[in-house]
């Protein structure tokens, strides 16, 4: 989990990100890997193929529960900053190319805070409004 500067809408001025790294090989087996093998489209395919969005959502629930317990003035919509999946084989340090402002090898998603809260409640056995 990373604590990063947030907006002024939080009591401590920070938001929190779940970060996970992956070493998946997304290129062709008959040629060397390049950062182009880790563009947004391929990352989305890899995420879906491996059910990483579900993993990200569950990690977000865990973070939500921790912050609810430990963060004074906790507000899910302000404090939950989303998830980053770092596909290390596609990242090239400062030379990592950008496509539409997104670095190769980095998948980001900010699940709606209401989804995280509702899933937490559901997993806790509570009724969730339809």
List the predicted regions and their residue ranges.
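Structural signature of nuclease core domains in nucleic-acid processing machines
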Residues: 1-130
């Amino acid at each position: 989990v990373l604590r990063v500067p947030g907006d002024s809408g939080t009591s401590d001025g920070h938001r929190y990100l779940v970060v996970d790294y992956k070493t998946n090989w997304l290129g062709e087996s008959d040629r060397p890997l390049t950062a182009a093998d880790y563009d947004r489209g391929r990352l989305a395919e890899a995420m879906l193929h491996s059910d990483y969005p579900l993993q990200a959502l569950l990690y977000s629930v865990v973070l939500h529960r921790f912050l609810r317990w430990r963060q004074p003035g906790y507000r899910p919509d302000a404090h939950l900053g989303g998830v980053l999946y770092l596909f290390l084989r596609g990242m090239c340090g400062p030379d990592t190319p950008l496509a539409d402002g997104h670095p190769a090898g980095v998948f980001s998603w900010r699940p709606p805070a209401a989804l995280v809260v509702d899933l937490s409640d559901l997993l806790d056995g509570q009724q969730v409004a339809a």
